[in-house]
Amino acid sequence: MLLTEKIAVVTGGAQGIGQAIATTLAREGADVVVADLDAERCQETVDLVQQSGRKALAVSVNVGEWEQAKGMMDRVLKEWGRVDILVNNAGITRDGLLMRMKEEDWHAVLQVNLTGTFFCAKAVLPSMSKQRSGRIVNIASIVGAIGNMGQANYAASKAGVIGLTKTIAREYASRNITVNAVAPGFIDTAMTQHLSPEIKEGLLNQIPLKRLGQPSDVADAVCFLSSEKAGYISGHVLHVNGGMHMAS
């Protein structure tokens, strides 16, 4: 197994891609903290992790609030002693064309997607620095690389995540901490399953591989970047989007 006895924190781990990441890390030997605003669904992921024979802890948290992000990390360090892997997956959307976008929708998306990533990284880096090891994997998006109509706030937040990833990677390389990002494209989740056939066909036409990705595709990429096999990779954006990044 790639992650035997490692301790991982996965934000936004209650469902979808986050749940796939949490369960994949567990199958590779990691104990997993499932952090999410949705406490009930957190427990569902915890149950799946425990079915893999690993320890799991559910933490209800709003990562966009510093005291909550720090409190979560302090609790994990107190109860489990260390954090080896942080996956910043928590994210929201509030889509709308720029001229119609409400200011509160702009701020809400930036607060969770970008500031939340900053807060969680800031909270865990002192302990990772002390142990002189760690893996941080931030979930970005193809939208952060190429933009998308109706998603100015989301695109800005994910572009910010990419820049933040590269900066933290530079600042903490001397501490043997690697920091990378995974940029998913259109993934087959509950949201895409409710799209009309016409809209789904339009999405597929943008993807060179002509299929939606699976949550497991993203989870496998995160697992690799969290492992010793990726020990010489830092500051990288791994595109998991069926080739959309080159088609743009």
Residue ranges and their predicted role:
Residues 39-40, 60-71, 103, 216-217:
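The beta1-alpha1 cofactor-binding region of Rossmann-like NAD(H)/NADP(H)-dependent oxidoreductases
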Residues 141:
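Residue(s) in the substrate-gating loop at a strand-loop-helix junction
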